[in-house]
């Protein structure tokens, strides 16, 4: 009888936000077409490490399981990505799972992404409305603009681009590429453009565009293929124009 194939994991764990991280190894039976989340569920069902010791179930975030929500981001074999689309058959073993280091660890592979959401609040990444009553159809966007704006709207706030960016870290206030790309998205909307100057001025503040080192890691790592560096370049132009308006004034009422 042939020996059963197994999958070996080395998982970086942390019991609390303030405790020291440590590595723990697990082994589960191999099944074809497994993804990392399925394997983590298997470990959770029977949390026994390779030493045969009963341990606590591994904690991580997940939701949609189809790369839409962005919740299951983690570092897999050194690369930040979604664990729901990371197929075991395509990964080198042992598979190393770590939490993203850009965000504070809550427990094990679960992180607190508040930093990113606070940046989205700072740049007003939404379109204000007066109420929930029907106002009828809004202004239409030119088709060419709609096409590139749609690409920006694919952002699922997964945090992978922030994890890949060398300028986003605990010593920096840099907001990172995802919130900046959303500024370009909402400024392109005919109604969202009403708050265009406020968003641009937020980017001109501390932690904004000036802190970008143009390493271009973000566009390489984005699971949705969003043209983040294109947005950053466009926003550099927009913020320069905004700086001139602030200095010389504008003839627009």
UniProtKB/Swiss-Prot annotation:
UniProt xrefs under PROSITE patterns: 4FE4S_FER_1, 4FE4S_FER_2
Cofactor: [2Fe-2S] cluster; [3Fe-4S] cluster; [4Fe-4S] cluster
InterPro entries linked to this entry: 2Fe-2S_ferredoxin-like_sf (IPR036010), 4Fe4S_Fe-S-bd (IPR017896), 4Fe4S_Fe_S_CS (IPR017900), Beta-grasp_dom_sf (IPR012675), Helical_ferredxn (IPR009051), SDH/FRD_Iron-Sulfur (IPR050573), Succ_DH/fum_Rdtase_Fe-S (IPR004489), Succ_DH/fum_Rdtase_N (IPR025192)
GO BP of this protein: aerobic respiration; respiratory electron transport chain; tricarboxylic acid cycle
Enzyme Commission number: 1.3.5.1
Entry keywords, A to Z: 2Fe-2S, 3Fe-4S, 4Fe-4S, Electron transport, Iron, Iron-sulfur, Metal-binding, Oxidoreductase, Transport, Tricarboxylic acid cycle
Enzyme class (EC, first level): oxidoreductase
Pathway where it operates: Carbohydrate metabolism; tricarboxylic acid cycle; fumarate from succinate (bacterial route): step 1/1
Catalytic activity: a quinone + succinate = fumarate + a quinol
Co-factor binding comment: Binds 1 [2Fe-2S] cluster.
Residue positions binding [4Fe-4S] cluster: 155, 158, 161, 222
One MF annotation (Gene Ontology) recorded for this entry: 4 iron, 4 sulfur cluster binding
Ranges for domain 4Fe-4S ferredoxin-type: 146-174
Keyword Metal-binding recorded: yes
Quaternary structure, from the entry: In B.subtilis succinate dehydrogenase forms part of an enzyme complex containing three subunits: a flavoprotein, an iron-sulfur protein and cytochrome b-558.
Protein name: Succinate dehydrogenase iron-sulfur subunit
Native organism taxonomy: Bacteria, Bacillati, Bacillota, Bacilli, Bacillales
